[in-house]
């Protein structure tokens, strides 16, 4: 069976996923598209040679009789309504982050999915599909380094634009760590604090950069995450797990080691899309396979809710300077195991 997908949102991310579905992945095809800018939708159909209907409204895509699953890559504040509509129609939906712009919105999706009685939602957190993170989790789960005690992490971007604001260090950047570190450790966060080192001269006047986020998990694991979005030298993701009897480190992406002109060097990537391109492929293929097999296994609506609650606490911590509690609702039995 070829899964027939409707895509809502044909901007950069939407078109990148359309490219995957059309040229890279197997078992699916795009049969419907929509974008707030009709020309964007037409351009996507032309560029990728789609045999797809262009709809003027995203809800029409959800309701279309030939659409079996929905891909939501539209503007963030529209995600909640489209995901809820897909659940109401009983159609599986892959939603790029954020699942909703508030924790309350995420909880409405959780409640709708639980009421439906079957998992329909996968959230677009791709790092759990990165082979480096998967290898790191295998080491942690094996017990080889003992119980994790501390994590030292960094998320560095070469630079960001003028529109990037201090809170976006949490909602656009740290959000990936909030998801993947919770997945690595298999437990929720208990508190968050944000501290500000000396500001880099490369940051815009309105942006606090770098920032250090301090997290504590329910069992007492301490995590520090450096967010430095104007580091200048490249795109660099680091994660070191300190255990009771050893240390495990996220491997850097493969790169040629160069010895030349009395120097030894390794190239560092500058683009986040290049760093995680394979992960995007794997996560979307997992969604296709999960729908076809009748069981989604990727990041759930509950994972989207958990990330939103933690992000809200981190933003409060940015503003208060205090240690902020991270209080989540009780996890429904629907999402356990």
Curated annotation (Swiss-Prot):
One of its GO terms (molecular function) is inositol 2-dehydrogenase (NAD+) activity. Keywords: NAD, Oxidoreductase. It catalyses: myo-inositol + NAD(+) = scyllo-inosose + NADH + H(+). Its EC number is 1.1.1.18. Pfam families: GFO_IDH_MocA, GFO_IDH_MocA_C. One of its GO terms (biological process) is inositol catabolic process. Involved in the oxidation of myo-inositol (MI) to 2-keto-myo-inositol (2KMI or 2-inosose). Belongs to the Gfo/Idh/MocA family. Homotetramer. HAMAP family: IolG. This is Inositol 2-dehydrogenase. It comes from Burkholderia cenocepacia (strain HI2424). The gene is iolG.
